[in-house]
């Protein structure tokens, strides 16, 4: 009995030491990565999908060499985007991370997003100096076409700005706009 009590006490103390503490606003439990076969998981949100609300998709770069949704979400308001697609530095190449704003069906927190009814996708990277990875490009096309299909968003409402202008972050001058547009649903 004493041995069992000692083991339970030790286990409890170890768990207390290893406890990371409560999740912050940016570290929502709804932040998870999805793989190729599970793209439909983006439609499994904590609240009902607001299908009538989402009218466009806004794609931009992080202007960082690496990172993930947690690092991009540091600051007062947390992650401003609905989705983050990794470049292999900070998270897996092509990994799609889903943020709290999407799982709660909230508007993007980006000041430069075109409209409040835009779904915001951030690709990790600085595409004014580098190019997205082939895996990022493939996963972006997969995500965008799934969103287009689900919410009936035409390709003309997939918004990309290739250069910074009037405070708009954009997708970067090296972003392959024509290649992405060729894969979109008209």
Language-model features, listed with the residues they occupy:
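A sequence-level detector of short, solvent-exposed, charge-rich linear segments
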Residues: 67-68, 72, 102, 115, ...
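Glycine-centered secondary-structure boundary/capping sites
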Residues: 75-77, 114, 152
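Short, conserved "active-site rim" segments that organize catalytic pockets and cofactor/ligand binding
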Residues: 38-104
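Basic/polar, cationic surfaces and motifs that engage anionic cell-wall
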Residues: 1-53, 96, 117, 123-186
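Short, surface-exposed glycine/acidic/tryptophan-bearing loops
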Residues: 98-116, 120
């Amino acid at each position: 009995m004493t041995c069992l009590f000692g083991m339970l006490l030790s286990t409890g103390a170890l768990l207390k030491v290893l406890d990371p503490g409560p999740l912050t606003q940016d570290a929502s439990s709804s932040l998870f990565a999805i793989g190729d076969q599970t793209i439909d998981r983006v439609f499994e949100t904590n609240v009902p999908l607001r299908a009538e609300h989402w009218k466009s998709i806004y794609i931009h770069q992080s202007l960082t060499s690496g990172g993930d949704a947690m690092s991009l979400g540091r600051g007062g308001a947390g992650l401003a985007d609905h989705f983050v697609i990794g470049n292999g530095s900070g998270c897996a190449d092509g990994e799609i991370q889903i943020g709290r704003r999407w799982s709660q069906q909230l508007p993007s927190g980006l000041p430069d997003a075109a409209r409040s009814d835009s779904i915001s996708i951030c690709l990790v990277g600085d595409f004014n100096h580098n190019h997205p990875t082939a895996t990022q490009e493939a996963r972006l096309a997969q995500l965008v076409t799934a969103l287009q299909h689900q919410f009936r968003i035409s390709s003309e409402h997939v918004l990309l700005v290739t250069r910074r202008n009037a405070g708009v972050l954009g997708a970067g001058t090296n972003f392959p706009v024509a290649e992405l547009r060729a894969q979109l649903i008209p």
